[in-house]
Amino acid sequence: MTKRALISVSDKSGIVDFAQELKNLGWEIVSTGGTKVALDKAGIDTIAIDDVTGFPEMMDGRVKTLHPNIHGGLLARRDLDSHVNAMKEHEITPIDLVVVNLYPFKETILKPDATYADAVENIDIGGPSMLRSAAKNHASVTVVVDPADYAEILDELSANGETSFETRKRLAAKVFRHTAAYDALIAEYFTAQVGEEKPEKLTLTYDLKQPMRYGENPQQNADFYQKALPTAYSIASAQQLNGKELSFNNIRDADAAIRVIRDFKDRPTVVALKHMNPCGIGQADDIETAWDYAYEADLVSIFGGIVVLNREVDAATAEKMHAIFLEIIIAPSYTDEALAILTTKKKNLRILQLPFDAQEASEAEKEYTGVVGGLLVQNQDVVKESPADWQVVTKRQPTKTEETALEFAWKAIKYVKSNGIIVTNDHMTLGVGPGQTNRVASVRIAIDQAKDRLDGAVLASDAFFPFADNVEEIAAAGIKAIIQPGGSVRDQESIDMADKYGIAMVFTGVRHFRH
């Protein structure tokens, strides 16, 4: 019996050659709409879909393949006499191969001028139905959704006259992933359209971007996936200009670094980061000086770190960065001379380019944190804060210079792992105390790191001080201004301690835990 293929594709790459090879192998081809036009134009004889269904394509193509003569030919089990007899009774011809890809819903909604009506019209109905029918009956039907699979299928058909069950099963799995992702993207779009904040079902669509050698440790398998609707300002969208491929830990650190620098939009800023904690942040009127400050913040920890800059990298800054070992440099752009300097004798240095003009869109994204058996979802910590809303709770008011330093410190502390403490002046970090299980230990680490640079320094805490001993440690170091959320039942004890030592203390009313 002559084998029958049904071909209906929106992506016509490679389809003419594939169909011609099928014809050469003796297959007959049923086709639809634009696909039939393309194949006919190439001189490939095809059967029109309406000759199979007995109905014309109608309603602007919305109804063309939803018919028993199509789905009966796809779903009929060849090993069941009742199914075979039903096909004979109703004059249904079995379909052995389905080649379908779907309306370009994703491509449509990514267009800047796409309307809601455009999106709706590009929701494919018949295509997923055929794919799912064929995939369900993969014991008998080969189903293809990806042009990359054409060559393998032709090789098997040429060698054996049919595809193997293993191949059909693998292709069926690919189809179910494809249709599930397609529907999930539609669901995501409609959820956003109606403004649903807490959907009872959560579907997320990601595409494999990079298979990884290993994960956080060599014994862990890992891969990197990118959102099906890419976020412009994200590590997943960064363009790599030089160096080895990014590792699992590189990606996490780079993601953390570009989150930090989002809060420093107004002035040239450089962030150095290690193990997802900032180890140096510098801000100045030019990017070279900002680099100097970030580097001087912690000369040791920056070694082998991640550096992100929010202005174009010039030759002078590149020369300084080239002088030390860095894992990754991220910037919106590089001068030709700077790029030449950074890549000289450093073929492994990962250099990434990331446009900084889409930061607000990235801030609107949800954060997803996996736990065993579940997923936590939250908004990002991007609350808009104004110093005008802060409260000075001590007798002593901060000086103008201290006010500037406190604003800088408060931006930086958001990205230090809790319990987080940071010591800064008005243009650079001086000491970072991250991730301790008691806050006073973080205070001691940050102060010890700042050492002899404490004159005029201020201190920020990501959450309230539970006891006044924190303030006592700070006072002993000579720091004269503190910024923290407040909110402890013992706030007054901390205020009294600050007053005792002539320290200005500001309450923001906003906590910035980071786990």
UniProtKB/Swiss-Prot annotation:
PROSITE patterns: MGS. This is Bifunctional purine biosynthesis protein PurH. The IMP cyclohydrolase activity resides in the N-terminal region. It comes from Streptococcus mutans serotype c (strain ATCC 700610 / UA159). Belongs to the PurH family. It holds the Pfam family AICARFT_IMPCHas. Gene3D superfamilies: 3.40.140.20, Methylglyoxal synthase-like domain (3.40.50.1380). Its EC number is 2.1.2.3, 3.5.4.10. GO terms for cellular component: cytosol. It comes from the Bacteria. GO terms for molecular function: IMP cyclohydrolase activity; phosphoribosylaminoimidazolecarboxamide formyltransferase activity. It catalyses: (6R)-10-formyltetrahydrofolate + 5-amino-1-(5-phospho-beta-D-ribosyl)imidazole-4-carboxamide = 5-formamido-1-(5-phospho-D-ribosyl)imidazole-4-carboxamide + (6S)-5,6,7,8-tetrahydrofolate; IMP + H2O = 5-formamido-1-(5-phospho-D-ribosyl)imidazole-4-carboxamide. Pathway: Purine metabolism; IMP biosynthesis via de novo pathway; 5-formamido-1-(5-phospho-D-ribosyl)imidazole-4-carboxamide from 5-amino-1-(5-phospho-D-ribosyl)imidazole-4-carboxamide (10-formyl THF route): step 1/1; Purine metabolism; IMP biosynthesis via de novo pathway; IMP from 5-formamido-1-(5-phospho-D-ribosyl)imidazole-4-carboxamide: step 1/1. One of its GO terms (biological process) is 'de novo' IMP biosynthetic process. Keywords: Hydrolase, Multifunctional enzyme, Purine biosynthesis, Transferase. Residues 1-145 form the MGS-like domain.
